Amino acid sequence: MTDAEIENSPASDLKELNLENEGVEQQDQAKADESDPVESKKKKNKKKKKKKSNVKKIELLFPDGKYPEGAWMDYHQDFNLQRTTDEESRYLKRDLERAEHWNDVRKGAEIHRRVRRAIKDRIVPGMKLMDIADMIENTTRKYTGAENLLAMEDPKSQGIGFPTGLSLNHCAAHFTPNAGDKTVLKYEDVMKVDYGVQVNGNIIDSAFTVSFDPQYDNLLAAVKDATYTGIKEAGIDVRLTDIGEAIQEVMESYEVEINGETYQVKPCRNLCGHSIAPYRIHGGKSVPIVKNGDTTKMEEGEHFAIETFGSTGRGYVTAGGEVSHYARSAEDHQVMPTLDSAKNLLKTIDRNFGTLPFCRRYLDRLGQEKYLFALNNLVRHGLVQDYPPLNDIPGSYTAQFEHTILLHAHKKEVVSKGDDY
């Protein structure tokens, strides 16, 4: 399925974002190097003034508080159109009651689109992953007004939805740099960029893949096509296994040639899309990317992240590597830690993140020091869950694309769609 098959809502328009007029600083070193050498020398002798980024808080850009709708798609299953009049009225009433919720989701989606428009062309080989993560997250903080959690009355009201995933090559997910990481993005790398925005706990989860070497183009095309196939198949009363089957069929129809070797693109069969719940990135339902026999159905009003991962490896990931991602446990544990440091850290986590995922860098930013022992203590007590990087076999390459969708009574809304993917 292609992007052209998705019909944009007139209200959405998803128009180009003139970020230059909003004052987003563009660091284009290449152009500076190509400038006249005499003028360049003069400029270097002048005192450099740091440009101030004027990314505006999103509320200032939409003073009426109404945010653009996503791209609308019809349900293609007949049974979604067979509602009785009473049922139609009931679902319409529910949609009206959910208006504030939908608007929060759309607000997060608009921020996500603006952030990726600001950063996508600035991701180039030679950058440290740490700098890429900071660029994405600081832009998100500026749009959401969550630049200083310590100064916010409610740090969980809106801001970053989860740590920025910057997973390279055979690592498919759950990698973000910890303090001191010096990893540099290379021309031959394939990097999954997965970041989130949340407004009142309503999370936008959307991801894309960056590569520079054209030999990976077919890998990215396969995964993007598979993701849109999943979006097309999704709908009220649709069985999850049927979505996975459709995704698998499309993904496996692609081949990619890398360094003279031809590989079938395989779905990473133990990675899934998922429903999203308030302040919980994984809401309870998993959307497979292979046929798995799960007859659970999607329901009206649900909020899903449809994501697919394709690999040139075995199509199966295992956990391994230094942990960076954490989240408060979904289970209600009565046992509390005995260490004072662990108790204090838990209070910091509860106040600033609640059940939203976080990473070590976020604790660093809050001024936490020497907290790793306390954090591991919380993990051992089951109060915090750690999420190690997920890897296919070394030497393989993985790609990811993802969108957040809303299931309305009569249509689905691809709320995070932009003009880029």
Curated annotation (Swiss-Prot):
* Residue ranges with Basic and acidic residues bias: 28-40
Required co-factor(s) are:
Co(2+); Zn(2+); Mn(2+); Fe(2+)
- Residues recorded as binding substrate, renumbered to this chain, are 174, 282
| Co-factor binding details | Binds 2 divalent metal cations per subunit. Has a high-affinity and a low affinity metal-binding site. The true nature of the physiological cofactor is under debate. The enzyme is active with cobalt, zinc, manganese or divalent iron ions. Most likely, methionine aminopeptidases function as mononuclear Fe(2+)-metalloproteases under physiological conditions, and the catalytically relevant metal-binding site has been assigned to the histidine-containing high-affinity site. Also zinc has been proposed to be the physiological cofactor for yeast.
| Keywords from the named record | Aminopeptidase, Cytoplasm, Hydrolase, Metal-binding, Phosphoprotein, Protease
This protein's source sits in the domain of life called Eukaryota
Per UniProt, what is one GO molecular function of this protein? metalloaminopeptidase activity
Q: Which InterPro entries match?
A: Creatinase/aminopeptidase-like (IPR036005), Met_Aminopeptidase_Type2 (IPR050247), Pept_M24 (IPR000994), Pept_M24_MAP (IPR001714), Pept_M24A_MAP2 (IPR002468), Pept_M24A_MAP2_BS (IPR018349), WH-like_DNA-bd_sf (IPR036388), WH_DNA-bd_sf (IPR036390)
- Please describe, based on the UniProt annotation, the reported consequence of changing residue 174 to A: Abolishes catalytic activity
SUPFAM superfamilies referenced in this protein's UniProt entry, alphabetically: Creatinase/aminopeptidase, Winged helix' DNA-binding domain
Cysteines joined through disulfide linkages? none
Q: Which residues bind a divalent metal cation 2?
A: 205, 274, 307, 402
- Check the record and name the CDD domains matching this protein: MetAP2
The annotated regions of Basic residues compositional bias extend over 41-53
One biological process term in Gene Ontology: protein maturation
* Span list, region Disordered: 1-53
Q: Localized where? A: Cytoplasm
Q: What is its main location?
A: cytoplasm
- Cite the HAMAP family for this sequence: MetAP_2_euk
Q: Tell me, what does this protein do in biology?
A: Cotranslationally removes the N-terminal methionine from nascent proteins. The N-terminal methionine is often cleaved when the second residue in the primary sequence is small and uncharged (Met-Ala-, Cys, Gly, Pro, Ser, Thr, or Val). Plays only a minor role in N-terminal methionine removal. Less efficient when the second residue is Val, Gly, Cys or Thr.
- PANTHER family, A to Z: METHIONINE AMINOPEPTIDASE 2
The record makes one more remark, namely:
Present with 1080 molecules/cell in log phase SD medium.
- According to UniProt, the name of this protein is Methionine aminopeptidase 2
The species is Saccharomyces cerevisiae (strain ATCC 204508 / S288c)
